Structure formats: C-alpha cells, structure tokens
Design a protein with these regions (language model features):
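Elongated alpha-helical scaffolds
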Residues: 1-8
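Active-site helix-to-loop segments that bind/position phosphate- or nucleotide-bearing substrates
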Residues: 9-202, 209-225
Length: 225
C-alpha cells in the first residue's frame, strides 16, 4: 500500500500480524524489482572478463559439456559462452558492455565480488550433534583458500548437505542403482532456491546454510519473487 507523495514515508506492507511501515531497503528492493528484465541481467559496468575466475568457469563448462554432449556452445570461447548464458552482455543502445550481475556472482573472482558486493557473505555450518562447548563441527566461509563465487559455494556445500542422507538400495529397470532420492532432490532444491531468490543488492545479507541433526536451514537476504 502506498500513501502520499514520498514512497519512503508512505509505503506499507502487510504480514500475518497486520500492516507495518516498509523499511528503506524493502522500498528500494520494490523499486528495483520493477525492472521487467530482472536484476540478474544488469550490466555491472567496468567488470570485464578479467574479473572471471578461469578455474571456476572451466569446471562449469566441463559439467555443461558432459551433460550437453555435442552442444554448439561447447566450441565457443569463454566470453561468447558467457554471453549465451547471460553472464556477459552489451547494451546496443549505450554501447556499455561487461559482466552481468549474475555472471559476476556466479563465476567471478572472490576479490571482484567482494569489491562490488561487500555486503554479501556466504556461510555454511554443520551444527549436527554439537555439544554446549562446540558451536559447529564443520564450516565453509571465506577464508582465502577458495574463490567465493556462487558456483564454488554451491559445489563445495552440496556434498556436505547430502553425505549423511540415507540411500536405500533401489534399481532402475532392475539394472542401474538409483542413489538420488526425493530427499536429496529436496535439499538441493532448497539450496538452489536460496541462491535464486536472494536480493544481492540489499544493504547487507548472508547466504547462510545450517545443517542440523533433524533439519536444514536456508537463509538469504530478500524475499521470494
């Protein structure tokens, strides 16, 4: 609900408890979300191919080639491949070109991402079977040993989330064993949704994944779109 002439003073939102005055970052988020093309496609000016972590992109392309054997994109150079994915773009009207928000976050070097998104942090903690004097028994956060982009965060954390899940013996067609259960898929989907629906342009936020003995917690900045 919007009342008056100043959106920062007259905007209200409603939750299960009633109406409340929207915060400035919620209002800025609503204004950004008016973009019909979405924010992922936004060109991050002055961020170019040098800001892409080559090893991250190589790993992604390797997975892409395995899953899409014979695809015409497999023969493209890295820049052209990113353009096809929407990770690099040129605005034909202004001539401005560069990595998109999605391209930088997904494949960028940790330094480039931290320079542009110093408000966003990635954190995984295994809090299952902890005691009163131990806060966690495993953690992944930025420590200088890995390029903290979204692709690396996803590929490093996903195996840790699913390694303890039960895998009942089941054969597909009586021949091939199926190790991927509905629970495995649900956990991955929750992780992916956390990444997709995060608002990376907020003032501050943490992509937080917590593994507990009986549940998984996925927390991100922003709301479902």
């Amino acid at each position: 609900v919007y009342v008056g002439e100043n959106p920062y003073k007259g905007t209200y939102k409603r939750n299960h408890e009633g109406d409340y005055h929207a915060t400035n970052y919620e209002i800025r988020g609503m204004i950004r979300d008016q973009n019909p093309e979405g924010n992922d496609n936004q060109i991050i000016e002055y961020y170019m191919m040098d800001d892409i972590d080559k090893e991250t992109l190589r790993k992604y392309r390797q997975i892409f080639e395995i899953r899409n054997e014979g695809h015409v994109w497999n023969s493209l150079d890295d820049k052209s491949f990113l353009e096809k994915l929407g990770g690099y773009r040129k605005d034909r009207r202004t001539g401005v070109e560069g990595l998109t928000l999605a391209g930088l976050l997904m494949f960028g070097t940790g330094q480039a991402i931290r320079e542009r998104f110093d408000n966003i942090f990635m954190d995984y903690r295994n809090e299952s079977q902890v005691t009163s004097d131990i806060r966690w028994n495993d953690r992944i956060t930025y420590d200088g040993t890995w390029e903290n982009n979204l692709f690396n965060f996803f590929t490093k954390v996903t195996p840790k989330l699913t390694e303890d899940l039960k895998k009942p013996f089941k054969l597909e067609g009586g021949i091939q064993r199926i190790d991927d259960t509905p629970v495995h898929k649900a956990v991955r989907e929750g992780f992916v949704n956390m990444i997709i629906h995060a608002d990376y342009l907020m003032d501050a936020g943490v992509l937080k994944v917590i593994k507990k003995s009986d549940e998984f917690e996925f927390t991100n900045p922003g709301i479902l779109k």
